[in-house]
Design a protein with these regions (language model features):
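Alpha-helical cap/lid subdomain in secreted, periplasmic
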Residues: 76, 99-244
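C-terminal motif of bacterial Sec signal peptides marking the signal peptidase cleavage site
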Residues: 11-14
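Bacterial signal peptide processing site
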Residues: 16-19
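Bacterial N-terminal signal peptides that target proteins for export
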Residues: 1-7
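Active-site-proximal substrate-binding core of FAD-dependent oxidoreductases
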Residues: 96
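Serine-esterase "nucleophile elbow" of acetyl-processing enzymes
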Residues: 24-90, 102-109
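Cell-envelope and extracellular/periplasmic
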Residues: 88, 92, 117-118
């Protein structure tokens, strides 16, 4: 499995050099969805949404990362009066997110949390077992210390992404499958609280030419729209109130 990771690391290095860790926005710059009318006894409850992730959570590749990332697009669908905090850090692997993002997420007292972390771990040659331990630690802590519903995205089929054009596609697919098996196992451990957001099945539109940005790796505006749609579908199915 480690050999497959070396192929991924080489491909990423060729297409996305020098990526620095940048977090936006901080909890102090959380966004509150404006109220459009005075609350009534039948008003839809507000949501406290926190996003945990890496550069795709930050919105790298979008024309306007702050407003065009997939979490920001998802937050735009929240009921009036809801709060949204994006804790994503570009370049983060899952164990780093556990240390740097999880405490802030718990402190926000969220009712909804999204997690999308995996590809950087794959590119960093982190074995699936180690990835599992880090992801499970994040999920278990959120379940134990918050009342949030947690939505965890898996890995799309990356074989058509330009950054992986020189990777061994058989090994790449095997590694994606191993990581997605881990994500499925972790999410199944908390039925009713943790939901798998499947970005793999039918993922061809997510990795088409128009949905990948000019760097050949991160999503474009069109890609972030499709990712937000996948998460929105999962949130609605789990009973989270979202606007049409």
């Amino acid at each position: 499995m480690r050999g497959a990771s070396v192929f991924l690391l080489a491909a990423l290095a060729a297409c996305s050099p020098g990526e620095r860790a940048v977090a936006i926005p901080s909890p102090s710059s959380a966004v509150t969805v404006p109220r459009t009318s005075s609350p009534t006894p039948t008003a839809t409850p507000a949501v406290r949404y926190v996003a945990i992730g890496a550069s795709d959570t930050v919105g790298i590749g979008a024309t306007d990362p702050v407003n065009g990332s997939w979490p920001a697009r998802l937050a735009a669908l929240l009921p009036p009066g809801s709060a949204y905090v994006n804790l994503g850090v570009s370049g983060s692997v899952t164990v780093q997110a556990k240390d740097a993002q999880l405490p802030g997420a718990v402190a926000q007292r969220p009712t909804v949390v999204s997690i999308w972390l995996a590809v950087n771990d794959m590119n960093a040659t982190i074995e699936p077992a180690s990835y599992r331990d880090a992801l499970a630690a994040i999920v278990n802590e959120l379940v134990a210390r918050t009342d949030a519903k947690v939505f965890v995205g898996n890995v799309p089929d990356l074989r058509g992404v330009p950054a992986y054009q020189d990777a061994d596609k058989v090994r790449l697919f095997a590694l994606i499958t191993a990581y997605n098996d881990v994500i499925a196992t972790v999410t199944k451990g908390h039925p009713g609280r943790v939901v798998l957001v499947d970005l793999f099945i039918g993922s061809a539109p997510l990795v088409s030419t128009i949905t990948v940005s000019g760097d050949g790796f991160h999503p474009s505006d069109e890609g972030y729209t499709l990712i937000a749609d996948r998460f929105a579908t999962a949130l609605r199915a789990a009973g989270v109130p979202l606007r049409p």
